[in-house]
């Protein structure tokens, strides 16, 4: 078949390709320019799954930023410094335009179909167009920068705007601002994601765009350069070099070889629309019609060939844009398509190739799988029928362990053959998270003349730039050790501490050496004058960890001159987490040096942590050499370059000897270049040394060991005399690294504790041993047990039938006569060498101490380990029992264990035990101490101590273990042995490369296989562990939905039912509780368990100490009996009760029980508990004593001492002298009551406690008769300040205004002087016999009265000295008020003054007590019930003229006769200063005592006016009595004068006009300023705690009742004109 045959087959081929490309694959789409309708939009979920895998991610590690900043960038310049000489950072993202424009199809004026690589490459450098990249703000917010590339961006970047259509070769995004910010100020890594634009996505569009992006070779370009250098944007500029050269570095990040292909779960996909990553054999040609190679045939070219039949319209519809891979050959050959390197993590990885099936008879297709470093295998291809003559060949690739490539071969039949391939793909080759591309960060250094060098060529002591700017000044600024020529000293290299006679490394000039251009100073070591074998080590500075996969190199020059009978090694020590690993990276051993400087470059691979270098030199006698090093440098590639390639094959395992862990302080000899082959050892071979069947204090014999080892690989020589008697001598079979495990012997058991013994210690170390080395091994033997014994007497002690030892202990508290019963100490295991006839210890595993006769079961003796051979190996201290033997000590005691140099024999039993009953418990061979009643000490490097006194409970101590500095401790010392000791020697298998540091060697393949923890399996790399994949069962979606729906419905039904049941139950309980609480009698027997919590204020304390709930004395409820009710308190009912079962009081104690209702708020519970805490902390005869509390059951109780006399106020009112009722009270009784309260206040003052409410209502009496004692009994106002919630209180607070000083209610200041003021008011209450202070004044009026300087007049018949105490307590300044010690002293003076105590009490003519007490009580809920206030009613005019005006009220001016004692009080009050206006008409006016004979008409009248109407707040309120009286006709003009006088005084009395009933009684500036114009401004202040109500008056409720405007009794007060101040 000729060329005509090919043309005949081409039209149906292209027609079929047109159909298949739209139906069989999802990677083809119609061209918008050609007219076909758009394909359906891609589903959103499908797009989301693929978008991440379609992106190209550039991730620059954060370490790059850190290293670039530390190595290259100077410190940030201040704004004032010049810009010249500084460094700048720039960045860009570049893509080739050719693959991107191919995706868009034919464009007007631009032709890419001819295969041109770029437009006009001969015109000069490749042109580029720069687009704006992302912003720093976006990067900082999203932690990454996403650049979306679509058709519009491609047209803008590669073609330009419509007015200037000019194709360029490179599309760039400017990232300079972003990179500059990140390198200077950023944190974390820099992530830039380039992905297809999502706008108007069509089926397959994003996949094609992603492939085009990858084919355009996206690369990230960074540059750091000095000002004036050429940059990425202007590489052609070559300025003149300045005096000081700066860095000019460029980085390119792009996908690295061999893993170039797209990583996603769809693998590689190539439809030949644009260049793919496939390789072709023979090479691909796009020009001409070669008959021997593959060729692209675009659809446009087929259209121009006019090969299709039919109308023109059909051509455009059936031939979409795109290309096909065609092959036309007549040769008998193979043509291959080769995929890039791939990886597969899925068993479903499949190869899919679309070919034309009509061409199949002319040739055949064969697929090959080519794994890395493995033989290839054929992939079976199975055809799948397609449309229009096309078929898809599919073959299973699977999951190869190594990277692989796939080759598709077309084998022609010899005749003219035609092959057409439309689609080549590797699908479903990854599961889970995509592994991502391997990005390489390539670095370069630009010279001033434009020469570009690799970064590794800079700072390598070799001048590559014409002017030498790649060396010298720039490199010398690197950190210490990076660039070292030793011209300025050691460059951070240090030497290990050496003795004075040891040779030292020196920095000096070496003369008479063939320098070959080398001049200057170097690091030198001379061995000429050293006769013995020695070594010297010098250590470099510490270097940071290199970047992962960086081409890190070490460059150095070295020289050996003279004869060196030894070797020189360069060791790299890596600082791993918790340990150090070292490996030899360079080694040389020679007899005679060449005296030439030699340059060496070493690759530093697999360094993942901080590291340092060590130069280790060893030489023997006869060495006369000089060793030198110079020009040592670490390549900058270590920290500024990422190769992106794996440095180790995935199936290779690290050599254990290369990862051997060494002690950095150890000067060990390198064994890398020892002559002779390295032996391949059998990992199952080991040498186990035992006691050879010997036991007791002496070691084995040669015959015993011959019998014990006759069937093993061991051959030992046993010492027969001297210190080596019983020591096994063994020759090392081969030079290698060995692990030596030493196990000390256990101690003997005691007579009474036969369950546990003290275990021997295990020590495992790693040592380098040479073939023929002699090891001396002493295996420790177990100490003898005390029981069982053949001696019948001793056996009876063992079984407990004989207690003679216990009897002696009971009588004498020690054991002497019947000594014995303690176990012997265990022997230590010694492994040592001989050096010049002197033993040198390698490993010593200590023996366990012997248990004592009566040893305790649980004892713990920590393991002790020594590694310093300069510590003396002494024997343990001996007492009655023997101490353990050490390394090189002497002893003369028979029962003490011997040291190794004395033969290490075990000690005998103590002499008394042998003499009394022959109880022998000897120590084990290896220095175990003999036992007595106490245990013997264990052997070791330092022997264990025995008890100094024969304590039958004191065990012997374990010995101290030892490991030589020549070895490495592999495991810590552990107590594990329960019998005789052992020594196990085997080849060391290093497992430090494994993730869990555990491994084993396969006996057949001799490969190291790592172990993994439970639940994990070994990964393919043979090192790391991964979670074993467990197939998750997939249930049907319908079943899952039905189960979830059913569960949800059931949960809702159960929840609703539960809520209804709980609600109904709670409702019933609440109803029952309400009925119970509303019942007349409360069932006190109903008790339930409960707890209460509170928090006290840490700023306050009681009596100088803090308080807590635990300080309260809890009284069991069963000991409390309630007798009768006493009344209602602040919280609940108060009962009289009895408490039985009190300590030191057999009779029941009478108490008062304060209760807290079960149903109460949390605030009430906290207040109740705080009051109990306060009262319980006081201990004074004048403060009510707290007997205890009962808080564990409901209702909660506070038990106080029973005060049968009641409260003081009620007592005074009930015992007032009346005309028909004389009283037994005298003035002295009132003074005694005042003295008692002052004593209690003094106690509170001394303990820094502020009561805040000293009033008669809060004081209680022990009894009403003679001998009464007054006590302070209520701390209600003190609760808040001593609770943490005091500072959180807001809103309305209740304050006892009439007992408070001005600074308290004006500024909220409470001190002990506050209680002094309150005590003065209390005195007024006592000597007025229970009257309310400030009679007839409301709280608001009291505020105005006190702040204006007014004070109360003395009560009737009040002695002058007593009133003087009151006035002193009422001083305006707190510091002028006396303390309670002075008050108590003055009261004592009053009790001794005859004029005071003989003063008669006034006779009461007012209403009886029963009438006064008929006042409304405080409701439980103050807000639930309006206060019972009496509204003022206008008096009838006819009643105004009925009653005459009382004489006492007609002339209250200066002409009025003052009551007795008033003169003294007035004098005291006048001494304080002039009375302000407004205080004169109400100051010192006492309405209660100005009416000695009240007219009986006051109690007559219709309705409610024939009895006084009073408002009394039992806690903080005030008395107000509205007493109707018959009015008399005042003299003409009297009333106007009174009103004028009141107005002139600035105060309107009750008769001046009614107040508004709805006004709130609050202290507001407007209220005071309106009524007190002459008061200074400093007195008009806000309260710091918000609104404050006085006397339970809430905002919006009426004030206290005031008199009617027509009340003559009150009007008469206003008729008198007071003189002005």
Curated annotation (Swiss-Prot):
<dbReference type="InterPro" id="IPR000998">
    <property type="entry name" value="MAM_dom"/>
</dbReference>
<keyword id="KW-0067">ATP-binding</keyword>
<dbReference type="GO" id="GO:0036269">
    <property type="term" value="P:swimming behavior"/>
</dbReference>
<feature type="topological domain" description="Extracellular">
    <location>
        <begin position="19"/>
        <end position="1042"/>
    </location>
</feature>
<feature type="glycosylation site" description="N-linked (GlcNAc...) asparagine">
    <location>
        <position position="449"/>
    </location>
</feature>
<feature type="disulfide bond">
    <location>
        <begin position="910"/>
        <end position="932"/>
    </location>
</feature>
<feature type="binding site">
    <location>
        <position position="1274"/>
    </location>
    <ligand>
        <name>ATP</name>
    </ligand>
</feature>
<dbReference type="GO" id="GO:0008201">
    <property type="term" value="F:heparin binding"/>
</dbReference>
<feature type="disulfide bond">
    <location>
        <begin position="994"/>
        <end position="1010"/>
    </location>
</feature>
<feature type="domain" description="MAM 2">
    <location>
        <begin position="482"/>
        <end position="640"/>
    </location>
</feature>
<feature type="domain" description="LDL-receptor class A">
    <location>
        <begin position="441"/>
        <end position="477"/>
    </location>
</feature>
<dbReference type="InterPro" id="IPR011009">
    <property type="entry name" value="Kinase-like_dom_sf"/>
</dbReference>
<dbReference type="Pfam" id="PF07714">
    <property type="entry name" value="PK_Tyr_Ser-Thr"/>
</dbReference>
<feature type="glycosylation site" description="N-linked (GlcNAc...) asparagine">
    <location>
        <position position="713"/>
    </location>
</feature>
<feature type="region of interest" description="EGF-like">
    <location>
        <begin position="991"/>
        <end position="1029"/>
    </location>
</feature>
<feature type="glycosylation site" description="N-linked (GlcNAc...) asparagine">
    <location>
        <position position="990"/>
    </location>
</feature>
<dbReference type="GO" id="GO:0021766">
    <property type="term" value="P:hippocampus development"/>
</dbReference>
<keyword id="KW-0597">Phosphoprotein</keyword>
<feature type="disulfide bond">
    <location>
        <begin position="692"/>
        <end position="705"/>
    </location>
</feature>
<feature type="compositionally biased region" description="Basic and acidic residues">
    <location>
        <begin position="1414"/>
        <end position="1423"/>
    </location>
</feature>
<keyword id="KW-0675">Receptor</keyword>
<feature type="binding site">
    <location>
        <begin position="1201"/>
        <end position="1203"/>
    </location>
    <ligand>
        <name>ATP</name>
    </ligand>
</feature>
<keyword id="KW-0812">Transmembrane</keyword>
<dbReference type="InterPro" id="IPR036055">
    <property type="entry name" value="LDL_receptor-like_sf"/>
</dbReference>
<feature type="compositionally biased region" description="Gly residues">
    <location>
        <begin position="1543"/>
        <end position="1552"/>
    </location>
</feature>
<feature type="glycosylation site" description="N-linked (GlcNAc...) asparagine">
    <location>
        <position position="575"/>
    </location>
</feature>
<feature type="glycosylation site" description="N-linked (GlcNAc...) asparagine">
    <location>
        <position position="289"/>
    </location>
</feature>
<dbReference type="InterPro" id="IPR050122">
    <property type="entry name" value="RTK"/>
</dbReference>
<feature type="disulfide bond">
    <location>
        <begin position="787"/>
        <end position="798"/>
    </location>
</feature>
<feature type="domain" description="Protein kinase">
    <location>
        <begin position="1120"/>
        <end position="1396"/>
    </location>
</feature>
<feature type="glycosylation site" description="N-linked (GlcNAc...) asparagine">
    <location>
        <position position="890"/>
    </location>
</feature>
<dbReference type="GO" id="GO:0060159">
    <property type="term" value="P:regulation of dopamine receptor signaling pathway"/>
</dbReference>
<feature type="disulfide bond">
    <location>
        <begin position="1012"/>
        <end position="1025"/>
    </location>
</feature>
<feature type="glycosylation site" description="N-linked (GlcNAc...) asparagine">
    <location>
        <position position="567"/>
    </location>
</feature>
<dbReference type="GO" id="GO:0042127">
    <property type="term" value="P:regulation of cell population proliferation"/>
</dbReference>
<keyword id="KW-1015">Disulfide bond</keyword>
<comment type="function">
    <text>Neuronal receptor tyrosine kinase that is essentially and transiently expressed in specific regions of the central and peripheral nervous systems and plays an important role in the genesis and differentiation of the nervous system. Also acts as a key thinness protein involved in the resistance to weight gain: in hypothalamic neurons, controls energy expenditure acting as a negative regulator of white adipose tissue lipolysis and sympathetic tone to fine-tune energy homeostasis.</text>
</comment>
<keyword id="KW-0808">Transferase</keyword>
<feature type="glycosylation site" description="N-linked (GlcNAc...) asparagine">
    <location>
        <position position="868"/>
    </location>
</feature>
<feature type="signal peptide">
    <location>
        <begin position="1"/>
        <end position="18"/>
    </location>
</feature>
<feature type="topological domain" description="Cytoplasmic">
    <location>
        <begin position="1064"/>
        <end position="1621"/>
    </location>
</feature>
<protein>
    <recommendedName>
        <fullName>ALK tyrosine kinase receptor</fullName>
        <ecNumber>2.7.10.1</ecNumber>
    </recommendedName>
</protein>
């Amino acid at each position: 078949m000729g060329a005509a045959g090919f043309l005949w087959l081409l039209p149906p081929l292209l027609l079929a390709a047109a159909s298949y490309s739209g139906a069989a694959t999802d990677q083809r789409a119609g061209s918008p320019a050609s007219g076909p309708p758009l394909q359906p939009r891609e589903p959103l979920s499908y797009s989301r799954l693929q978008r991440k895998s379609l992106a190209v991610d550039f991730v620059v590690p954060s370490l790059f930023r850190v290293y670039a900043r530390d190595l290259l960038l100077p410190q940030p310049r201040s704004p004032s410094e010049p810009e010249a000489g500084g460094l700048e950072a720039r960045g860009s993202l570049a893509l080739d335009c050719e693959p991107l424009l191919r995706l868009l199809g034919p464009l007007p004026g631009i032709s890419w179909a001819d295969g041109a690589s770029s437009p006009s490459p001969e015109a000069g450098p490749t042109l580029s167009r720069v687009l704006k990249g992302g912003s720093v703000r976006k990067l900082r917010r999203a932690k990454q920068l996403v650049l979306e590339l679509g058709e519009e961006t491609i047209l803008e970047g590669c073609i330009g705007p419509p007015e200037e259509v000019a194709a360029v070769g490179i599309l760039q995004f400017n990232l300079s601002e972003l990179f500059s910010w990140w390198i200077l100020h950023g944190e974390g890594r820099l992530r830039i994601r380039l992905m297809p634009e999502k706008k108007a996505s069509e089926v397959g569009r994003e996949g094609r765009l992603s492939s085009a992006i990858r084919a355009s070779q996206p690369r990230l370009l960074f540059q750091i350069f000095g000002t004036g250098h050429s940059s990425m944007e202007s590489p052609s500029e070559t300025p003149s070099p300045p005096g000081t050269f700066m860095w000019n570095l460029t980085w390119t990040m792009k996908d690295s070889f061999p893993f170039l292909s797209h990583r996603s779960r769809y693998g590689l996909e190539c439809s030949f629309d644009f260049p793919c990553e496939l390789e072709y054999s023979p090479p691909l040609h796009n020009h001409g019609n070669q008959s021997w190679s593959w060729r692209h045939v675009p659809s446009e070219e087929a259209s121009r060939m006019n090969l299709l039949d039919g109308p023109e319209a059909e051509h455009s519809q059936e031939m979409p844009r795109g290309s096909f891979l065609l092959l036309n050959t007549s040769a008998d050959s193979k043509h291959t398509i080769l995929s890039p390197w791939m990886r597969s993590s899925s068993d479903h990885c499949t190869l899919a190739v679309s070919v034309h099936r009509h061409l199949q008879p002319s040739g055949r297709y064969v697929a090959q799988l080519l794994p890395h470093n493995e033989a290839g295998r054929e992939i079976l291809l199975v055809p799948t029928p397609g449309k229009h003559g096309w078929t898809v060949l599919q073959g299973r690739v699977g999951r190869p362990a190594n990277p692989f490539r796939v080759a598709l071969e077309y084998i022609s039949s010899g005749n003219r053959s035609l092959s057409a391939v439309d689609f080549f793909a590797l699908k479903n080759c990854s599961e889970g998270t995509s592994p991502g591309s391997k990005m390489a960060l390539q670095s370069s250094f630009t010279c001033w003349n434009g020469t570009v060098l690799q970064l590794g060529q800079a700072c390598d002591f070799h001048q590559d730039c014409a002017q030498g700017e790649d060396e010298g000044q720039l490199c010398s600024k690197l950190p210490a050790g990076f660039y070292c020529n030793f011209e300025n000293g050691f460059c951070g290299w240090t030497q290990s501490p050496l003795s004075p006679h040891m040779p030292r490394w020196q920095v000096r000039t070496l003369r008479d050496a063939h320098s070959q251009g080398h001049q200057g100073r170097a690091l030198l070591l001379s061995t000429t004058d050293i006769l013995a074998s020695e070594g010297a080590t010098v250590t470099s500075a510490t270097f940071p960890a290199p970047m992962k996969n960086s081409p890190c190199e070490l460059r150095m020059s070295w020289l050996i001159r003279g004869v060196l009978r030894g070797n020189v090694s360069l060791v790299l020590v890596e600082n791993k987490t918790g340990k150090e690993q070292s490996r030899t990276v360079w080694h040389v051993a020679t007899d005679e040096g060449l005296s030439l400087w030699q340059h060496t470059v070493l690759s530093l691979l697999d360094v993942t942590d901080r590291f340092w270098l060590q130069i280790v030199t060893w030489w023997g006698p006869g060495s006369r050499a000089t060793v030198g090093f110079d020009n040592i440098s670490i390549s900058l590639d270590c920290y500024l370059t990422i190769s992106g390639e794996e440095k180790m094959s995935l199936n290779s395992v690290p050599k254990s000897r290369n990862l051997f862990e060494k002690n950095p302080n150890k000067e060990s000899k390198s064994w890398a270049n020892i002559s002779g082959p390295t032996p391949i050892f059998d990992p199952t071979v080991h040498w186990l040394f035992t006691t050879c069947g010997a036991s007791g204090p002496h070691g084995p014999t040669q015959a015993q060991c011959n019998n014990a080892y006759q069937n093993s690989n061991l051959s030992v020589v046993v010492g027969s005399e001297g210190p080596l008697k019983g020591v096994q001598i063994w020759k090392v079979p081969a030079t290698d690294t060995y692990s030596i495990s030493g196990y000390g012997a256990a101690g003997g058991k005691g007579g009474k504790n036969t369950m546990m013994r003290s275990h021997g210690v295990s020590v495992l170390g790693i040592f380098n041993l040479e073939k023929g080395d002699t090891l001396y091994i002493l295996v420790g033997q177990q100490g003898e047990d005390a029981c069982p014994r053949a001696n019948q007497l001793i056996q009876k002690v063992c079984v407990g039938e004989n207690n003679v030892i216990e009897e002696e202990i009971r009588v004498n508290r020690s054991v002497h006569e019947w000594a014995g019963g303690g176990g012997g100490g265990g022997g230590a295991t010694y492994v040592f060498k001989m050096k010049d006839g002197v033993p040198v210890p390698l490993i010593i595993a200590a023996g366990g101490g012997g248990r004592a006769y009566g040893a305790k079961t649980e004892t713990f003796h920590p393991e002790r380990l020594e590694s310093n051979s300069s510590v003396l190996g002494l024997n343990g201290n001996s007492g009655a029992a023997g101490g353990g033997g050490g390394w090189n000590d002497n002893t003369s005691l028979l029962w003490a264990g011997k040291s190794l140099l004395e033969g290490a024999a075990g000690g005998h039993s103590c002499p008394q035990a042998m003499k009394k009953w022959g109880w022998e418990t000897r120590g084990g061979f290896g220095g175990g101490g003999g036992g007595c009643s106490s245990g013997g000490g264990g052997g070791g490097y330092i022997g264990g101590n025995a008890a100094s006194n024969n304590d039958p409970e004191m065990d012997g101590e374990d010995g101290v273990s030892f490991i030589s500095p020549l070895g490495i401790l592999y495991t810590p010392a552990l107590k594990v042995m329960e019998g005789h000791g052992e020594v196990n020697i085997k080849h060391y298998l290093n497992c430090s490369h494994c993730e869990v540091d555990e491994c084993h060697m396969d006996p057949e393949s001799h490969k190291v296989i790592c172990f993994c923890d439970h639940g994990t399996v070994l990964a393919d790399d043979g090192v790391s562990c991964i979670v074993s994949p467990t197939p998750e069962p997939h249930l049907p979606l319908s079943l899952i939905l039905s189960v979830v729906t059913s569960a949800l419905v059931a949960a809702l039904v159960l929840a609703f039912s539960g809520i209804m049941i709980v609600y109904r139950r709670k409702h019933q309980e609440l109803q029952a509780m309400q009925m119970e609480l509303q019942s007349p009698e409360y069932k006190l027997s109903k008790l339930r368990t409960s707890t209460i919590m509170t928090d006290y204020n840490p700023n306050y304390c009681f009596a100088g100490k803090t308080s807590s709930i635990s300080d309260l004395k809890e009284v069991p409820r069963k000991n409390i009996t309630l007798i009768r009710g006493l009344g209602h308190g602040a919280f609940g009912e108060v009962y009289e009760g009895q408490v039985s079962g009190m300590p030191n009081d057999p009779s029941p104690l009478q108490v008062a029980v304060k209760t807290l209702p079960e149903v109460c708020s949390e605030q009430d519970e906290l207040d109740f508990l705080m009051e109990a805490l306060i009262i319980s902390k006081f201990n004074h005869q004048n403060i009510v004593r707290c007997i205890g509390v009962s808080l564990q059951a409901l209702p909660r109780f506070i038990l106080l001492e029973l005060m049968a006399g009641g409260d003081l106020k009620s007592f005074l009112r009930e015992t007032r002298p009346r005309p028909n009722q004389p009283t037994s009270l005298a003035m002295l009784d009132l003074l005694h009551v005042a003295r008692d309260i002052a004593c209690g206040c003094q106690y509170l003052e001394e303990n820094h406690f502020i009561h805040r409410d000293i009033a008669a209502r809060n004081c209680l009496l022990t009894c009403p008769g003679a001998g009464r004692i007054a006590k302070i009994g209520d701390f209600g106002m003190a609760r808040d300040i001593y609770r943490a919630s005091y500072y959180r209180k807001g809103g309305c607070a209740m304050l006892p205004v009439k007992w408070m000083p001005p600074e308290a209610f004006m500024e909220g200041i409470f001190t002990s002087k506050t209680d002094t003021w309150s005590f003065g008011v209390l005195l007024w209450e006592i000597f007025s016999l229970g009257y309310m202070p400030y009679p007839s004044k409301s709280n608001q009026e009291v505020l105005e009265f006190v702040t204006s300087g007014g004070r109360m007049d003395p009560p009737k018949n009040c002695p002058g000295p007593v009133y003087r105490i009151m006035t002193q307590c009422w001083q305006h300044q707190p510091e002028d008020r006396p303390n309670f010690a002075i008050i108590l002293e003055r009261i004592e003076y009053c009790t001794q003054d005859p004029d005071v105590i003989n003063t008669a009490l006034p006779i009461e003519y007012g209403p009886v007590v029963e009438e006064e007490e008929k006042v409304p009580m405080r409701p439980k809920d103050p807000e639930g019930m309006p206060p019972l206030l009496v509204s003022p009613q206008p008096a009838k005019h006819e009643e105004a003229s009925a009653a005459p005006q009382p004489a006492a009220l007609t002339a209250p001016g200066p002409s009025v006769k003052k009551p007795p004692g008033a003169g003294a009080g007035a004098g005291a009050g006048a001494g304080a200063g002039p009375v302000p206006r407004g205080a004169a008409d109400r100051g010192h006016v006492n309405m209660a005592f100005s009416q000695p004979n009240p007219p009986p008409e006051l109690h007559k009248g219709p309705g409610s006016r024939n009895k006084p109407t009073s408002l009394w707040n039992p806690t903080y309120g005030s008395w107000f009595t509205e007493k109707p009286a018959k009015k008399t006709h005042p003299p003409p003009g009297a009333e106007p004068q009174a009103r004028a006088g009141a107005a002139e005084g600035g105060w309107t009395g009750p008769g001046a006009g009614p107040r508004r009933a709805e006004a709130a009684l609050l202290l507001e500036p407007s209220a005071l300023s309106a009524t007190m114009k002459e008061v200074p401004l400093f007195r008009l202040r806000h309260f710091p705690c918000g609104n404050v109500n006085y006397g339970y008056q809430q905002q919006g409720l009426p004030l206290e009742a005031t008199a009617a405007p027509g009340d003559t009794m009150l009007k008469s007060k206003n008729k008198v004109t007071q003189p002005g101040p």
